[in-house]
Amino acid sequence: MSSEVDSNSHHAAVVIDNGSGVCKAGFSPEDTPRAVFPSIVGRPRHLNVLLDSVIGDSVIGEAAARKRGILTLKYPIEHGMVKNWDEMEMVWQHTYELLRADPMDLPALLTEAPLNPKKNREKMTEIMFEHFQVPAFYVAVQAVLSLYATGRTVGIVVDSGDGVTHTVPIYEGFALPHACVRVDLAGRDLTDYLCKLLLERGVTMGTSAEREIVREIKEKLCYVSMNYAKEMDLHGKVETYELPDGQKIVLGCERFRCPEALFQPSLLGQEVMGIHEATHHSITNCDMDLRKDMYANIVLSGGTTMFRNIEHRFLQDLTEMAPPSIRIKVNASPDRRFSVWTGGSVLASLTSFQNMWIDSLEYEEVGSAIVHRKCF
């Protein structure tokens, strides 16, 4: 694929999906993101004049992941919300460098979590216009974009990434905020839980670098059980994972015990709803006339919904809670890890969307509060 994009091409734009764990970026109207990298900023663990001159003050993304042994890794986004704007700015700068794009050349569409605080949206708008000097800007709700990626405008999105899980009912392209449920349990919590389960086996994975290895183990070997109690009795099939230093870790029931927390958060000591319960709660909070459509259009989205068997277990557990006559359909696209980005690319390329952009003139006239008027 060419590394260039024609800025004069029809409705070209930069699309950036800011995930808590992974940043996905590329150009509209392309189908897949060109840059996918960890949303991490690494800083040297120990002050070392020689080392500092070699790797600089901070390292972003893949480079930070590669040098994790000598770095302390930080995530600028926690539970879907930006917590450190200076580091977030570094991640965006790195994004444009990877895309080999000048921010001043193309409009930028960024994503946000549902129920994102107003001040966060304003800060994002301010940075994009003031620091990056983009010609036009828009911020869209992640779950809505996931729904667009499936060609729907009505349905409920169960979006679980690294930092947060949301169940978001959407009607005619608009999220219904009163029925959204946010659960602060997602991929990062499952990684921590797997660290704890490995500790029970006598394997200590405590540093931020070792946690990244555990995340890789989780993504490669874990799966969702259809019958947790029964499989616990059978202890699960054993798999071996080889660490970079050659040491081998044996995993048995940990492989399904880890993602089980999505359905039974009490395993983590959390008093929150499982993903099937949160979905049921969201649908129940919708208008009676919408519920049938919601049950028939459930869309799984985000990296933490990529576990094998998750859609079958989800359907099984939700069916037990739903009215007996209701038809439930769960959409689990193989590309759902990138569905937010894909939906953003689709939206930014629509002719009908072009008058939705906030342009620099509007920003100069109104300021960052313009984002509430044009992005909802």
Curated annotation (Swiss-Prot):
Xref: Pfam families: Actin
Top-level taxonomic group: Eukaryota
Gene3D superfamilies hit by this protein: 3.30.420.40, Actin, Chain A, domain 4
Necessary and sufficient for recruitment to the fusome and actin cones of spermatocyte cysts: region residues: 1-40
Compartment list: Cytoplasm, Cytoskeleton
Annotated InterPro entries: Actin, Actin/actin-like_CS, ATPase_NBD
Name of this protein: Actin-like protein 53D
